[in-house]
Amino acid sequence: MEVNDGERVVIAKPVASRPSSSSGFRTFTELLTDSVTVSPQTTCHEIVDAAIRPKTLRFNQPVAASVSCPRAEVKGIGNGMSCDDDSDSRNYVVYKPKAKLVSKATVSALANMLQGNRQQTWRQSEAVSYGKSVSQGTHRAGPNLVQKVPSFTESETSTGDRSSVDGYNWRKYGQKQVKGSECPRSYYKCTHPKCPVKKKVERSVEGQVSEIVYQGEHNHSKPSCPLPRRASSSISSGFQKPPKSIASEGSMGQDPNNNLYSPLWNNQSNDSTQNRTEKMSEGCVITPFEFAVPRSTNSNPGTSDSGCKSSQCDEGELDDPSRSKRRKNEKQSSEAGVSQGSVESDSLEDGFRWRKYGQKVVGGNAYPRSYYRCTSANCRARKHVERASDDPRAFITTYEGKHNHHLLLSPPSSSTLPFNSPQLSKQTI
């Protein structure tokens, strides 16, 4: 019992340490007493304060803060304060802005604006260099010619058959996606028989022609009368009411108030009349519409072609398998008529109204073949017209199918044809 009443002695295991010269040697009892009496919390806080101290980025303080710093040193030395402690409470906090989320439309719009500025700068530089080369005479043609055309936009049809700005007629026969270009490269060949010239056309994102590479040389002259570009002419897109003077003549044989049977007259200058007369004298007739003229012969009716070497052709109309099969069946079950005529006015009328939907160059004939369809609703009659290879002034017309309606136009006299009558030519053309 006496042992239990006595004071309990706590014995702590001493930690081995090397003696230092400053503290000297100490006895085991002193070391034991120090280990029991020392507060572990104070030692822990001192170690943590010495080990973990955040590093801050300080900016230059105003003059007032720097002036007040010595006062803090004088007054706060006894309290353990310093100039650094005072400046810690006055630090400036810099906030970094956060990025905002924007929609995809905004991002694409900004990208297009940036790309547009780059394209405009490139075009201006290319235009200046191209103008200098032309003025100095260094831009000459050759067998393999590379042309930079930054400002020209070449529109093409579904098949790419188009008379381009160089004066020749081209037919697109393929395209391929190449590295380093977002748009595919188009391949063209000259439509003239036995002409080996080909060209490659590369376009920019906006659709403009950026590079044209020619291969070979033309073995023929430029076509004398290329067809007008379909993109720039709105004259073949419909009909409208003719002037009253034309309706009073009764040249079309219909009611003058009926807009369906009235051709579209668009040229109103004497210069265009002279140019049209010159074209007719050369055997090349350019008309924006198809109109009716009487025939004096007993052969099957025919119509005229434009007579120009162009390879415009609606691929959707000519190369559609279902349409081609239907035309073959109609051709076998119907009476196909073939007639020949001349370029005179009496060879351009068969009493029906036709709409030209394409033309293409066929093998063995240097002149294109034109394709027409009847404008009447639900009528499947078609025809194609081509020039004779031996006689350019003769036409061969082939009809496919039968008309399921009566004549649309009454045959007028040949003197009422617009480009044969001087009176009508002066009033309407």
UniProtKB/Swiss-Prot annotation:
It comes from the Eukaryota. Keywords: DNA-binding, Metal-binding, Nucleus, Repeat, Transcription, Transcription regulation, Zinc. InterPro entries: WRKY_dom (IPR003657), WRKY_dom_sf (IPR036576), WRKY_plant (IPR044810). Residues 214-279, 292-348, 410-429 are annotated as: Disordered. Transmembrane segments: none annotated. GO terms for biological process: epidermal cell fate specification; seed coat development. GO terms for cellular component: nucleus. Residues 159-223, 343-408 bind DNA. GO terms for molecular function: DNA-binding transcription factor activity; metal ion binding; sequence-specific DNA binding. It is found in: Nucleus. Pfam families: WRKY. Leaf promordia, trichomes, atrichoblasts, fertilized eggs, seed coat. Transcription factor. Interacts specifically with the W box (5'-(T)TGAC[CT]-3'), a frequently occurring elicitor-responsive cis-acting element. Regulates trichome development, production of mucilage and tannin in seed coats, and maybe root hair development. This is WRKY transcription factor 44. It comes from Arabidopsis thaliana. The lineage of its organism: Eukaryota, Viridiplantae, Streptophyta, Embryophyta, Tracheophyta. The gene is WRKY44.
